[in-house]
Design a protein with these regions (language model features):
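Helix-loop boundary and gating motifs at the non-cytosolic
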Residues: 6-55, 208, 220-229, 233, ...
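Helix-to-loop junctions at the C-terminal end of transmembrane segments
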Residues: 61-74, 154, 158, 254-266, ...
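Cytoplasmic helix-loop-helix junction between adjacent transmembrane helices
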Residues: 106-141
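Paired small-residue
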Residues: 99-107, 296-304
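Intrinsic disorder in cytosolic terminal tails and internal cytosolic loops
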Residues: 1-7, 187-198, 380-415
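Intracellular juxtamembrane helix-capping segments at the cytosolic ends
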Residues: 114-127, 310-324
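Structural signature of the two symmetry-related core transmembrane helices
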Residues: 76-91, 169, 269-284
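C-terminal membrane-cytosol helix-exit motif in multi-pass small-molecule transporters
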Residues: 154-155, 169-190, 374-383
Length: 415
């Protein structure tokens, strides 16, 4: 790790290690809950609701976390919510009930929101204008790598047993150690922030808000019900793990190239192109990959799909930042994060009901969301000029759960 970054933020290695462990456990938990829910006889709509519960918890937690940090500080907030997040997976094991699982997953989302905000506010406080983009991009790429690692844990244990939940609890609990033991001083608690309504954001950047919401629908639905889709295709546990990991790997590989293109070209064209490619990859998978297809064909299609959908939020945020002033950016980011979180909560619910109606319900939901981005983007492209190059902000890779400091500060309420 570059010495200049650790000099700016001495706790950077500890923050990244804690974040890596958190995201590894969270990704593994999301996948195992979907598969275990099906084993336990949950309906697809109920499994979707469990996934939606996480994002509902993230939104609520983000509304409250900044106030808690202001009251007790970064390290105590992280340790307290981390302890609860480490215990929550065991609730799924102890009580096999879809409604209890929804509540437990929402509790996990609430705790993770607070933990993410602690890490992101710590990074933002130590970063300068010269290195902030680099630090946050390293943070985002760390989250993507952790997502890949979490998916690949699936074949190491039996999803019908108790061990997966114990492993998840251990991983999340271990995330507390690097940050709780760091010798670097924690930053000052975040201050109060301004608020920008979603209505105003939509007027300033309609495509940014729409892409943020629909991108949330897509990623929320895919990462909740993708394992069930793969299982219905006849894939083994190991193949399901590779299938899901390929989706995240595609995002890891494609994030920087898409970002560079968006910095040089009209961002709207990049957003439209990425959505069109995502829809095309899914359509190809439906047409050329029947249930008995070679797994590698599914891996290839899902890698392209993940490569196009995972950077959508980062592209939408960059597009939004081109339309608002620097002073309004924190509040505007919070509004976009709200739209993204709402979409990520709605996506699993919509896809769950769609899969209950037809085995291809997930694919239809994902394709529909991406086609809507394309249609809306084309409409906006011909109705408004592009942002001047001089006004374009730099692209930065966002983590897989992009709800953090900006949302918390812009929408925080007292603890």
């Amino acid at each position: 790790m570059p010495g200049v970054l650790t000099a700016a933020i001495p706790a950077l290695p500890a923050l990244l290690l804690g974040f890596f462990l958190m995201q590894t456990g969270n990704t593994f938990q999301g996948t195992i809950l979907s598969i275990r829910g099906e084993i336990e006889g949950f309906t697809l709509a109920q499994i979707g609701a469990v996934g939606a519960g996480f994002w509902a918890g993230v939104i609520i937690g983000s509304l409250r976390a900044a106030g808690v940090i202001r009251r007790v500080g970064h390290i105590r907030t992280f340790a307290s919510f981390g302890a609860i997040a480490g215990a929550a997976p065991l609730v799924h094991l102890l009580v096999i009930d879809p409604y209890v699982w929804i509540a437990a997953r929402a509790l996990t989302g609430f705790c993770f929101a607070a933990m993410f905000i602690v890490i992101e506010s710590w990074l933002n406080a130590g970063a300068s204008s010269e290195n902030r983009g680099q630090i946050l991009s390293i943070y985002g790429m760390t989250g993507l790598l952790a997502g890949i690692g979490g998916q690949l844990l699936l074949p190491t244990t039996d999803p019908a047993g108790f061990r997966p939940f114990c492993i998840i609890a251990c991983i999340i609990s271990l995330a507390l150690a690097p940050i709780a033991l760091t010798q670097g001083a924690a930053p000052a608690p975040p201050g109060e922030g301004s608020h920008v309504s979603l209505g105003r954001l939509y007027r300033e950047s309609p495509l940014g808000v729409a892409a943020g919401f629909l991108g949330g629908v897509t990623t929320g639905a895919f990462f909740t019900l993708g394992p069930i889709f793969a299982e219905m295709r006849g894939l083994s546990m190991g193949e399901i793990a590779i299938f899901m990991a390929c989706g995240t790997l595609g995002g890891f590989v494609a994030a920087w190239p898409l970002g560079l293109l968006s910095d040089r070209w009209d961002r709207r064209l990049v957003i439209i192109g990425a959505a069109a490619a995502a829809a095309a990859s899914l359509t190809t998978m439906l047409a050329l990959a029947p249930g008995d297809a070679y797994p590698w064909l599914l891996y290839l299609c899902v890698a392209l799909f993940g490569g196009m959908i995972i950077p959508t939020y980062s592209l939408a945020l960059a597009h939004l930042s081109d339309a608002v002033s620097q002073e309004e950016m924190v509040a505007a980011s919070g509004g976009l994060l709200l739209a993204h979180g709402a979409g990520a909560a709605a996506g699993p619910l919509i896809a769950g009901f769609a899969m209950s109606a037809t085995p291809r319900g997930l694919s239809y939901t994902l394709v529909a969301a991406q086609v809507l981005i394309v249609l809306f983007g084309v409409r906006r492209f011909f109705s408004r000029a592009a942002a001047p190059v001089a006004h374009k902000s730099a692209f930065a890779v966002e983590p897989p759960v992009p709800v953090g400091t900006e949302f918390a500060i812009a929408h925080s309420t007292p603890a």
